Regions:
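Catalytic histidine-centered segment of alpha/beta-hydrolase-like enzymes
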Residues: 208-221
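Active-site loop/oxyanion-hole signature of alpha/beta-hydrolase fold enzymes
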Residues: 3-11, 15-57, 222-225
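Conserved serine/cysteine hydrolase catalytic core
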Residues: 140-196, 201-204
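Flexible "cap/lid" loop of the alpha/beta hydrolase fold
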Residues: 67-72, 77-110
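Conserved alpha/beta-hydrolase catalytic His-Asp/Glu region
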Residues: 92, 107-161
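Alpha/beta-hydrolase active-site loop signature
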Residues: 21-25, 87, 209-212
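Structural signature of beta-strand start/N-cap positions in the alpha/beta core
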Residues: 15, 50-55, 77-79, 173, ...
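Gly/Ala-rich beta-loop-alpha elbow adjacent to hydrolase catalytic centers
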Residues: 58-62, 66
Length: 228
């Protein structure tokens, strides 16, 4: 869905860089995993490709990375869109997701359909199962392996659910996008958020939970494009 979204954005005269963060997708694997390092990765990427300023869209973990990057390097950020996350700590457990993925012996999996059938033991949402199956890729021996560094992500996911702390506020405007059916953004934590992002705006997308770009891609695209 991010690929589809990025293609549509690029058709509106934007140069788009679609980045996988460390231990995710096609990016490198590392035993170290926290927001400070992911901000460093993004800054190094911009330096490597001589990018002087950006508009950033970040969802969930990517949203927290985007917020910390903007706090540390405000002069490099033109527009900031944070999708269904706040700079606060969350008491959410991802154990079921990690358990489901790590319980599969990928050497015995012969097809994606077989992988999806295994995940049905854990999840009822077919769309979410398909989302998790995007972690699969073919290994050199013709079998399957995970793109993401699942074992390290499980070991360090408390770093992802932790809050973003910084000694200065971000003085530019920022747009927070909330999914109507998601509980990641609430009024109490918005008060905390306003201390770091006093000029924030909030919009809500109907018929969507946490995975807004997947559940209501049309409204999500329209809101992002209009803001950019």
């Amino acid at each position: 869905n991010w690929i589809t979204f990025s293609k549509k954005i690029s058709e509106n005269n934007f140069e788009v860089h679609l980045l996988d963060q460390r231990n995710h997708g096609k990016s490198f694997h590392s035993n170290e995993f926290n927001y400070e390092l992911m901000v460093k990765d993004l800054h190094e990427y911009m330096s490597k490709f001589n990018i002087n300023s950006v508009s950033i869209i970040g969802h969930s973990m990517g949203g927290k990375t985007a917020m910390l990057f903007s706090l540390i390097y405000p002069d490099l950020v033109e527009k900031l869109i944070v999708v269904d996350i706040l700079p606060v700590s969350y008491n959410k457990s991802y154990d079921l997701i990690f358990d489901s993925l790590l319980s599969i012996n990928l050497k015995q999996i012969k097809s994606r359909n077989e992988f999806n059938l295994h995940l049905k033991k854990y999840f009822d949402d077919h769309g979410f199962i398909l989302f998790l199956s995007k972690n699969l890729k073919r290994s050199l021996d013709g079998g399957f392996e995970y793109k993401s560094n699942i074992k390290i992500l499980r070991k360090t996911y408390s770093n992802v659910t932790s809050s973003i702390n910084f000694h200065k506020e971000y003085r530019k405007e920022v747009l927070f996008i909330k999914g109507e059916n998601s509980d990641y953004i609430d009024s109490e934590n918005l008060k905390i958020t306003s201390k770091l992002f006093p000029k924030y705006k909030l919009t809500e997308i109907k018929n969507a939970g946490h995975w807004i770009h997947h559940e209501n891609p049309d409204d999500f695209f329209s809101i992002c494009l209009n803001y950019l």
